């Protein structure tokens, strides 16, 4: 039947506003949810029935229309469509946003997709979106020019004005100076006049005084002076001297002198006055000049300032580019400078407008391509990142502006329910709170815009709306997370998807299922291997519907309702019905944790009393179950196909071998082993020892008459051969009459009893059977009966009768499994019986302390005392003392163990339990009877003080305290290890989940060389490693050269023996590592399925098996990165689980080893400070020979230096010989030899604690390890290539597991390593259209290159990438698988932008969308049916449809056919549709149409 779910790919992309509106059934405009009085949804609210559909089936909101007959009617009163209420799980609504908002995934992701597209840094983008900065969205170029001219004109006018003002000031200053100078001239003349007048007055005074004195002297002439006569203070005549003519002359002289002095003073005063005037004049002139200069400077300053201002404004105009981000201040300035020239805005609306106006994807792609070609380094890296986003948009058909939301979808109400609690309060999904915030803010914003509110208020409301939408989509991604009541962070849509509790992991990959139950398990020793005991009460509940149906069929109840009542009342008839229903019905048993596929197996249910599930003891190993309170879950496979699959594939008796290593996992253990060991022991001297019997029957008779002990050695004559070696004497006897070999063997009754229970081909085993021996019996039984050569036609027909006509290999597998299951059950019964009869148990008396122990301890104490003495004397260091003490006590512990071993009674229960492998080992017995020995402290360092006591003697308080360290560490270690191993398994499953066997043969010629085990005892023998592989090349006998086996032959046990016998030490086999299958693997590269021992079938999910095989034993690995002790190697060597993680995550290992970077010779150099350096010197010599023809002579000297292109010889007619090398030339007779040395050196500094592995002068190869430690796989890949790193990873992982005694087949690790190396990084894209640095699947890369080469283009080049499993999982082609693994939001963001198509090739993606997985029986549906089959089916459907039309109305049932748009087509159109499709197919057009449609639109379901 064609189904609407029958599509083969799913696509994710960005939703356009139109898409969101088309999904929606109405706009949500109110934040209300439900009315608290009526408890009915509010109209236009988040739960509105008009938008999302009715809350009750077939009933509208107001109750006008009730019942199904009104189906599809839309109520004219309340507007609700009458339909089923489940539409509320699928109908969406929408909110028209008052202002666009950005989608936070595309803004805040790393890298920010929106930021890359617009070439804006995430910080700036955030500032714009959250209204802190403006972004220019429009610049009017014509207005810009006008603005520029206006600015220039304005500044020119301002300059003119300033210059004019300065000129006026200059004139004013000049006039002032002229006036000042004129005034000074006048003042100077006035001063001169005053001086002249003053001196004239003084002269007159002197003349007047002289005249008066003369007159007096003339009066007194001829007399003696009676006193001194003075003239102006100068004596003219002294007292007593005569006054005469001379006296008058003297007076004239004095007058003359006085007048001269006066004249002198007058001249000086005039000169001083003139000088002062000149100085004042100069001062005034200087001040005027200074003022002029200041004026000039001020003018220049103002002009410069104007120039700068003008330049700045013009520059600001020049920077007015669309997309420029400006602050509030800058915006205001620019608005003032150039009003109306540009438009800047804030928020998501601005960004959306910018995208619509400026982003031309094609043009941008071309520009970025050119930049990648022309630039280097960081610029090129950025351009590549941007181009990746641009190309994603171009190829996907998404529009960049859809990253900004204008319409917000509202998810269906039943996905964000609101439920009433007991107290009348309501519990609601966080999403309702988040939606309510968005609606409130949106409505408020609408109102503010209508009211023309101030810009700042509107802007704030827009920012709050943006934040509300951010919180709804991904709460807490930016800023503080929105919290609800009680500080609890609200769960957003992103939180609904991601993490362990998210939609992917909680609901899509991990659904809870109906028809299941769980209970405690107890052992069911009487069950057969394929049975389990199911408590009746549990079975009745699980099979309730089946029982009810059976009661109605048998007439016990009239209808289902009565039957239900009968079952609930548990009437006696119910048990009979249950017995009938459950007969041959299979149930699945599962024990958590389900670490591998054997954790879920199918069993036939046997009804039992009680409440515990009974489990067969032999399947405990597969489930890792014990009976100390473990619980198991039961599941009922319902459909016929599920039952069939459970029977053919999951039944416990068909799961005998472990998929991890191919050995039996159904291995007897504990009591069974002990019983069989007890049976096959030989006790010399027991009752009847040495007796001889003519046959087995005779010996058994003697045993039954109690004449023999079960363990007594007796001689028996028997026919046939021995299986394997005997541990007792055997004597050959003459052949019997029919040619059968006969012998006389020494054996015991116990061994006869055991062999009686073995299948005839496995007899006669005459040796002590321990756990290993029982495992061999099971393995031999399976191998014998699954080998077609050993089966008769009758045996195969027997299987055919019960299992249908299958392939003979499959029949052999089924027969072998059933025979082995029978064998296991018989051994189980025998083991339990004789463990009981033997009565072996442990008591305190069985633990005997050996007498030797005390001597050993005393001796050790003496040795320790000697060491202490040496230390005190300073002969040894503290570290040496510690090492020696630890060594002494370790040796003492070893000797004690040996003493305990020797002291044990081999027939005692303790020794039997230990040596048989039933329980316990010699170390544990030694702790009870010997000494406990050394313990570790919390850091893992050994405490040098041992516990000398044992548990039999009892521990002292100190002993007990010291041993608690180790105990506690052990518990903590186990808890942590379990979580780590679980996470490792999850990552492994994720990386390999799409590795499925998809094709028969990929045809590759490549393969893997398997070599014989070298000195590494951890590696397995070649015979074991090549078993189940397929030869990649023919193999020949080493000496004779004859063909042993051709290519593509499976290496089975016989062929493996033949290959080794031929002397071959290595084989070239196919491997998952070299498989060329485009998806998954091919059968031949994988080889044998270890769980069946046969070649793997198509559809086997080998990736999951590999992951489980590696992850399941993870808990057995240690967590420690432990100390090797000693100074020689002080580095910690990572081992156990951390080392496995290191390998699979391809991390740089702890204690990394140095690798040689080139081939060459080692020189170890040590400098003065003791730092060691390894120098590798590589010298390659190239020679070129030039014969000298007749007439040629050299133009160079012997041993002279020459360079490439130099003429080294000349001949007749100007002929020349030119050298191709640069080096030294040697002339040897009639030829010239040019030799060139290519010299390379590498230096590596050795860490101080590293041990060097190489010697001075040793020759090393590139990639060779130079120091101890682990190699970095990334370096190894670079130096030695892909094959070397594959080999290294597989071997290193195996070393860790083997060191812990865990056996895993190589091919499982190879599958994981293949996935780690699946991707290549593009270096040069050629003509492929890929991007440099892009990671792409290697198969896809090969396909693209082949296509390009066939079209004559340039192929791309790429480098192999080694990715850790986490990174490889996230780089898978399936976005559903990657999103359900980790980083959900990032994966979905990328996938949406790229418009990714998931072709549903892996398992996870199919589980997520609810399809059958493409593995096992599920792959049969995927293998395309031929064209004719499809036509046949169409024709049959058409015929059925016509018959249905002709049938009476009451018997006719409508079978609507799905139409491509997902709606049901009307019944009457059925045959028209079918007929049209059939005609298309018959005309041969149908296929073409379909393929075209698929090419055009990958997300349409294939019809």
Swiss-Prot record:
CC terms in the record's Gene Ontology section: DNA-directed RNA polymerase complex
Residues annotated as binding Mg(2+): 626, 628, 630
GO molecular function terms attached to this record: DNA binding; DNA-directed RNA polymerase activity; magnesium ion binding; zinc ion binding
Catalytic activity: RNA(n) + a ribonucleoside 5'-triphosphate = RNA(n+1) + diphosphate
EC number, UniProt record: 2.7.7.6
Keywords associated with the record: DNA-directed RNA polymerase, Magnesium, Metal-binding, Nucleotidyltransferase, Transcription, Transferase, Zinc
Top-rank lineage group of the source organism: Bacteria
Gene3D superfamilies recorded: 1.10.132.30, 1.10.150.390, 1.10.1790.20, 1.10.40.90, 2.40.40.20, 2.40.50.100, RNA polymerase II, clamp domain (4.10.860.120), RNA polymerase Rpb1, domain 3 (1.10.274.100)
GO biological process, one term: DNA-templated transcription
Region (Disordered), start-end ranges: 1439-1503
Binding note for cofactor: Binds 1 Mg(2+) ion per subunit.
NCBIfam families, alphabetized: rpoC_TIGR
Subunit and interaction comment: The RNAP catalytic core consists of 2 alpha, 1 beta, 1 beta' and 1 omega subunit. When a sigma factor is associated with the core the holoenzyme is formed, which can initiate transcription.
Descriptive protein name: DNA-directed RNA polymerase subunit beta'
Lineage of the organism: Bacteria, Bacillati, Chloroflexota, Chloroflexia, Chloroflexales
Gene: rpoC
